[in-house]
A protein has these predicted regions:
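Short N-terminal binding/cap micro-motifs at the start of the first secondary-structure element
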Residues: 13-18, 41-42, 82
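Residues that mark the start of a beta-strand
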Residues: 5, 29-31, 145
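Extracytoplasmic/periplasmic beta-strand context in beta-sandwich domains
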Residues: 18, 85, 100-101
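N-terminal Rossmann-fold NAD(P) dinucleotide-binding loop
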Residues: 155
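Short Gly/aromatic-enriched secondary-structure transition segments
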Residues: 45-52
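Glycine-rich beta-strand-centered segment in the early N-terminal region that forms part
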Residues: 23-38, 52-93, 116
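NAD(P)H dinucleotide-binding glycine-rich loop of Rossmann-like/cofactor-binding domains
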Residues: 67, 90-149
Length: 155
């Protein structure tokens, strides 16, 4: 079986890089070759403080908690994605594994990117999902005074 590189958090504040097998696909899954991966604040919280359900699961799965990335479809068992397409892995900390060369992922966590697009710029679309989620949860703010705090890595 083919091998790949993958980061792996083996305990709090400890990440190693190791060779593991490229994941095999099951029905309706997509194999994505990671081209770009960003480090989200959530990743730091998981690794440095044990934040989220992952804390009790050390060592973490290969490639986790990386969940923000751009990649290329290498193999697909989904009718919605074809080999060669460039995709954005939708932020899902429990499904994505962008800190590995390859990840087998449910297509519901993938977004097709336009051909010949600037992948570095589109990587920032990950941030947009957080803004969209927050906007939907705060309700109507028309006529109210609000503060936006924490620009994060996009700031």
């Amino acid at each position: 079986m083919k091998k790949m590189r993958a980061a792996r958090a083996i305990k709090l504040k400890t990440i190693i890089c190791e060779e593991v097998e490229v994941p095999e696909l099951t029905d309706n899954m997509v194999l994505v070759k990671t081209k770009l991966a960003s480090i989200c604040g959530s990743d730091l919280h998981v690794v440095n403080m044990g934040y989220t359900a992952y804390a009790s699961d050390f060592p973490l799965p290969y490639g986790a908690p990386g969940h923000e990335g751009v990649g290329e479809v290498i193999e697909s068992r989904s009718p919605d994605f074809s080999i060669g397409e460039t995709v954005l892995t939708d932020p899902n900390i429990y499904s994505s594994k962008t800190f590995a060369d390859y990840q087998a992922i449910d297509p519901k966590y993938l977004v097709k990117l336009p051909k010949n697009s600037n992948e570095n710029k589109l990587m920032m679309a990950q941030q947009l999902a957080t803004v969209e989620y927050s906007s939907k949860s705060i309700g109507d703010i028309e006529g109210k005074t609000i503060a936006v705090i924490g620009q994060g890595s996009a700031g």
